Amino acid sequence: VKLTILGIGDIYNFQEEKGRGGFARLNAVAKAERAANPNTLYVFDGDMLSPSILSGFDKGQNTIDLTNLAPFDIAVPGNHEFDFGVENFMEKMAASKFPWAAINITKADGTPVEGLGGVMVKDMGGVKVALIPVAQDTTPEVSSSGDLKFLPTVETAIAAAKQARDDGADLVVGVVQTNMDNDRMLIASKAFDVIMSGDDHSYATSYDGITAYVETSIEGRYLSPVDLVIDISEKDGKRSVKWTPNFRFIDTASVTPDAESQAMVDGFQKKLDD
């Protein structure tokens, strides 16, 4: 089975900059990846509702409208999702045509946040993939997350990854918003097969023979779909899962913007210009 995982995060401005990035190019890549391989997972690892000039007016609705044209399989709220308060995030979550999730965010009393999911298990061509969505635990210090409670990013992520493996996941994928120091701890845990991480505003890939890792750039400038060729065999009732990663590099300067998305972008630009 060939599985493709495309991750993105830290995308704030609807328009491109110097012919690179922006939602119209991002959506073009997402649509093309899905068309090329039905076993594609498209994940968001945090930060889009703010900050941008237009978000100052619409509290991030423009980013929801644009991502709804090429919806994610799962979206993790970043700290900037709470810049306009919890109520606004709840409204934007309800307006999304994709699921938001984070295993380490609860209400003040520890009960689940309505509409916010947890670990997601997907069957991709017979491969059981567990998506572990984890938010940045420093969010309350830098954003307006009200009385929401954020459990420790690293410990919660590793515990959930190990549990997913025990529950029979063939592949464990972390979708996290956290800094590179925490990323290194997640990689060192050997609990994840793949980690898609945002927050650092940089682009990086690595593979240590156990975990394939992508730091998912900023503003959708550079994208790295990861293709995993997965071989599953069963012997004496035991499942053996083997895979190798192929990191592709896409400089979005070479991508033709998605027409539907570009029309929406042009409309938003006109609003700003007026």
Task: Please annotate each region the language model reported.
Residues 260-274:
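Active-site nucleophile-His-acid catalytic modules used for acyl/amide transfer and hydrolysis
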